[in-house]
């Protein structure tokens, strides 16, 4: 039998908003890199306050990231009476064994926003470890699951492990909540992710609901601004979330801001500061239409791109531009760069 897991929250950060029940959600990022480096790609662990049943939002990073974070003491897994299922088994790499066991015990679901490699790479490579005794469920909108079946788990690019019972695919509908754990449900939204050689690309956003506290958390995959999209889709999300923000039931948004301000022709289906602020101004107007003052919203920024020849840290430039534009627009939003290996509870 496996030993019970106790996770210590090293480098702990608590974000609290007056009026909210504490610890409705836990967020822990395994990777927030927007490229072009292949390390630390998009993967965010989401759970309730107990951090027992964990959903991996995207799977660009997984097992190797867990090993690294355990090894570096950013994630401590204690209370082990046995590392493996087998007696008299010598464990050469304890961090590897703990990461394997943590994934096996706690992370049963991968919620995929879209099928670009930087969002699925880790989950695909690691799927060989799952096994029919501990299968994982891969959840997504229909176009995500169709792409994974046809173009990834197809016995060409990667074995069809669903046929071997290693993984189960689950399609979720954009018009209804679906329970993924005992306490958390999701409401999916399709979003635009630009176009490539004339073909429109789609991604996803998910509104998480804690069914016990009736609190919410909004998380985006890669997303294109409505202002440049062929069909505006983000507005539907802002409309759905505005009443929740007005009621102080939603305080945090995980959203990308890939680069400092650049021309629209170079965005390739991503946000930059001016477009993010513009979208949030629309959201704030919708919230204020309920006759309330906009509560301060926390935007956790992810998918920042890097370049070896940049003279300034892109995160610093992005934050500076966001704060300047936000101030000019009287936007009630706090921007934070999502930190890998750090717990957020709200």
Swiss-Prot record:
Entry keyword Metal-binding: no
A Pfam family that the UniProt record links to this protein: PDEase_II
PROSITE patterns to which the protein is assigned, alphabetical: PDEASE_II
GO molecular function: 3',5'-cyclic-AMP phosphodiesterase activity; 3',5'-cyclic-GMP phosphodiesterase activity
InterPro entries to which the protein is assigned, alphabetical: cAMP-PdiesteraseII_CS, Pdiesterase2, RibonucZ/Hydroxyglut_hydro
Catalysed conversion reaction: a nucleoside 3',5'-cyclic phosphate + H2O = a nucleoside 5'-phosphate + H(+)
GO BP terms, alphabetized: cAMP catabolic process; negative regulation of adenylate cyclase-activating G protein-coupled receptor signaling pathway; negative regulation of adenylate cyclase-activating glucose-activated G protein-coupled receptor signaling pathway; negative regulation of glucose mediated signaling pathway; negative regulation of meiotic cell cycle
Keywords: cAMP, Hydrolase
EC numbers, comma separated: 3.1.4.17
Superkingdom of origin organism: Eukaryota
Gene3D superfamilies associated with the record: Ribonuclease Z/Hydroxyacylglutathione hydrolase-like (3.60.15.10)
GO CC annotation terms, alphabetical: cytosol; nucleus
Protein name: 3',5'-cyclic-nucleotide phosphodiesterase
Disulfide bonding pattern of the chain: none
Keyword Hydrolase in annotation: yes
Family stated for the protein in its record: Belongs to the cyclic nucleotide phosphodiesterase class-II family.
């Amino acid at each position: 039998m496996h030993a019970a897991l106790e996770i210590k929250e090293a480098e702990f950060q608590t974000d609290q908003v007056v009026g909210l029940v504490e610890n409705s959600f836990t967020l822990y990022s395994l990777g927030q890199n927007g490229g072009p480096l292949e390390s630390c790609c998009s993967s965010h662990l989401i759970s309730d306050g107990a951090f027992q049943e964990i959903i991996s939002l995207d799977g660009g990073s997984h097992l190797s990231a867990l090993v690294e974070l355990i090894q570096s003491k950013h994630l401590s897994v204690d209370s082990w009476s046995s590392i493996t299922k087998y007696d008299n088994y010598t464990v050469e790499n304890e961090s590897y064994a703990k990461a394997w066991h943590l994934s096996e015990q706690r992370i049963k679901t991968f919620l995929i926003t879209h099928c670009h490699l930087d969002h699925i790479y880790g989950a695909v490579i690691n799927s060989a470890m799952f096994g029919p005794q501990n299968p994982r469920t891969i959840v997504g909108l229909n176009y995500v699951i169709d792409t994974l079946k046809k173009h990834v788990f197809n016995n060409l690019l990667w074995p069809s492990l669903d046929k071997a019972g290693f993984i189960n695919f689950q399609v979720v509908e954009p018009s209804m909540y679906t329970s993924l754990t005992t306490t958390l449900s999701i409401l999916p939204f399709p979003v635009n992710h630009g176009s490539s050689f004339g073909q429109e690309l789609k991604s996803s956003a998910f509104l998480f609901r804690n069914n016990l506290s009736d609190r919410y958390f909004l998380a985006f995959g890669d997303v294109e601004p409505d202002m440049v999209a062929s069909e505006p889709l983000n507005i539907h999300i802002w409309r759905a979330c505005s009443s929740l923000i007005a009621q102080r039931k939603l305080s945090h948004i995980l959203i990308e801001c890939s680069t400092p301000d650049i021309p629209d022709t170079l965005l390739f289906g991503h946000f930059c500061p001016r477009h993010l602020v513009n979208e949030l101004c629309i959201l704030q107007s919708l919230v204020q239409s309920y006759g309330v003052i906009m509560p301060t919203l926390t935007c956790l920024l992810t998918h920042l791109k890097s370049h070896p020849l940049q003279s300034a840290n892109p995160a610093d430039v992005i934050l500076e531009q966001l704060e300047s534009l936000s101030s000019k627009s009287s936007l009630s939003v706090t921007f934070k760069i999502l930190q890998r290996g750090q717990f957020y509870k709200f």
